Amino acid sequence: MQSGNLPLWVKQALDSAPEEIETYIYGEDIDVEIPPAYDTFPKLLLRNSKEIGNKTALREKKHGIWQRITWKDYLENVKKFSLGLIALGFQEDDKITLVGDNRPEWLYAYLAAEAAKGIPFGVYQDNLAEQLLPLIQNSGSRWIYCEDQEQTDKVLSILDELPEVSRIIVKDWTGMWRYRDNPMLISVDKVMELGEELGKKEPGLFEENLNSQSKDDVACFATSSGTTGVPKCVMLSYENMMFMGLALQKVVSMSIEEDYFSFLPLAWIGEQMMVFSCGLTTGFRVNFYEEPETVNNDLREVGPTIMFGPPRIWRDMLAEVQVKIADAGMLKRKIYDMAMKIGYTCVDREFKGQEISAYMKFARQLAYYIVFRPILDKLGLKRIRHAFTGGAQVSVDDFRMLRAMGVNMKQIYGQTEISGISCLHRDGDVDPWTSGKPLPRTVIAITKRGEIISKSPAVMLGYYDRPYEDDVVDGWLYSGDMGMVDAKGHLVVVDRLADVITLQDGTLVSPQHLENRLKFSPYVREAMILDNGRPYVTAILNIHFENVAKWAEDNNIPFTGYMDLSQKTEVYDLLESVVREVNKNLQESMKIRKFISLYKEFDPDDEEMTRTRKLRRGLIRERYREVIEALYTDAEEIDFVGEIKYEDGTRDQVQVRMKIRRVE
C-alpha cells in the first residue's frame, strides 16, 4: 500500500469507498483536462477538419487500392449523414444500432447520430438474429444501420418484434434489388443526399446541434461482456470516453503520424477507445481492411505503429510462427532457437529491473535483424511502437515471446464500464504477470474479499436497460474480478471471483492461468479447466483445427473433419504431451489429471462464448454436465448426444463417442 502524503483526489476517493479495503494503488497525479470547446467527439472532428483538414484521417482499401479520406472529407460525410437522419425524423435522444464490419461508414453513422443529439450503439456483426433481438429491444433503438444484405436479412427476420424501429439504413446494396420497394430500407447515399439538401436549407443546423452538447451528455451505449447472459447497455458519457483517451496519452506517447489498423469489431469498447477516444483527440490515421478475408495481407501492407487486440489475436499470430518454425529446416530452427534464447534472457532481466550487458545488447540487436525483424514484417508488426492486449489476461508465455521478439507489448486491464482502461504497463516498467499501474487520476482498490474496484472520471453513468443492476457504488466500479497488488505497485488480476476454483484440499486454482498455459501450444485453440470442489483438476480441450490438421497430414493420419480428427488416438497423444508440459511447472494439487478433446469448438453462435471470445462457464457446465461427471469416474470414454452446426447454418444432433485421457 502506498503511504505518505496522498493527493487530495486520492483521499477523497478512499474516503468514499463503500467498504473496507485491503490495499490500493493510484495513477499519476497529473491533470487530464478536456478542452471545453472540444468536449464531444463531433466537436473534435470539427476541430480536426479546421486545423489538419487536408491530412489523412481514414484509409480504406477498395479493389486492392488504398483510398484516402481527409479530415475535411470525414467531417463532410458525418455532417451530411447527421442532417440526413434529421431530415428522416431522427430526434434528440434517439438510439441507432450499428451492425457491420469496420468501414468508414460505420464511423460516419456513429458520429452522425451523436451530432444529431442521439446515441449510437454498436453490436457485434456476427450475432445471430435471435441474439440481436434483445440488444436492439433493450437499447430502445428506433434506427438501425446495416452494412449489407446479410445484416439486413437478420434485422428483417425479427422486425415484427421491433415495432419501434422506423428505418433501416443500408450501406451495401449488392444483391438486394428485390428489396428496393421496401419502405423500411434506405441507402446511406440517399441519407447523405437528404442531408445535403437540408444543409442548404438550414446551413447552421449542424454546428448549432454540436454547440448545444457537452461532455456530460451520453456519447454512446456499449455492450458489457455478457459472460453471464445477454450483454447490458452500458451508458458512457463524452467525459468518460475522452478522459480515458487523454489519460492514456499522458503515459503512452501518441502522435498525429501514427497508423492504427482497425480490424477488431467496432462494437468492442477497445476498438472504440482507439478509433474515437484516441484517434479523434490525437488525429492519427485509422486504416480499414478490404474484406475480413484479407485482414492479414492488409495488416502487412499498413504496418501499423499502434495495435490493440485481445489475447486470441496475439496467440493466433504466435501459433502461425510456431507452426512455420516447426516445419523449417534444422539450421533455421537452430538459429531461431538461439535468437529466442537471447530474447528471453534479455526480457527476463528487464522484467526484474536488471541491467543487460553490452554483449547481450549486441546479441539482441543481431537476433532482431537476422531473425525477428523478417518474422515481424511477415506479421505486419515491423513498425509497431505500442502493442496493447486487453479484454482478458494474456498468457505469460505469449507475453514473454512477443517481448522477446521485439514487440513492445503492454497488458491493459479494464472493463466496458470504465470506458475500456483502468490499468496498463508503462515503458520500462513491464511485468508479464501483472496489468501494470492505474491511469492518471485513477484509483484501484482491493476489497477484503479480494475484489478489484476502481474509481475514475471514466466510470460509466450506469446501465440503460437495467438501472437496478448497478455495479457502481458511490462512484466505485465493482469488477467481479479477484486481484492483488504486488511489491512494485502493479495490479495482478487473478481471475473472475466466481470462476476461481477451490479444490477439496483447499487449494485455490485460477482456471484462466492454467487455460492460458495450455493455449500456448499451437495445437490447443481453447481450454476450460474444471471444477469447484472436485478432488483433482481436469480440462475440456478444443483442438486448433488448422494446426492439428496440418500436423496430421504431415504424419499421414487420415481424417474426415473436425469431429473425426478431435477423437484420433494420435491427437490425444499430442494433447497429452501438451498437458504434461504444462504440468511440469505446477504444484502437485494443481496438475491436470484428466482431459477430454471435445468433438466441436466452443462457439459464440452456440452461446458457449461471448463475442469477445470469453467462456460462458455456467452454460458450458450445464450443457456438458455428463461429460464433466465422466471425467471424475473411472470411465475411459463417454457416449454423448450433442449438436453440430453446418456451414450453411443448419443444425443436427449427433451421437459421438469421446475418449477420456488420464495423465499419470
Label each PLM-derived region with a short phrase.
Residues P438-L503, D531:
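Conserved ATP-binding/catalytic segment of the ANL
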Residues E150-Q213, V321-P374:
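ANL superfamily adenylate-forming
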Residues A37, L46, A57-L111, L128-L133, ...:
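Conserved AMP-binding/adenylate-forming core of the ANL superfamily
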Residues G53-T56, I186, M192, E196-T223, ...:
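Conserved pre-ATP/AMP-binding loop-to-beta segment of ANL
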Residues R68-K72, D189, N211, A219-M244:
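Conserved AMP-binding A3 loop
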Residues I501, E526-M528, G533-P535, W551, ...:
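Conserved C-terminal "lid"/linker of ANL adenylate-forming enzymes
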Residues M242-D259, L266-R373, R383:
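Conserved AMP-binding/adenylation subdomain of ANL enzymes
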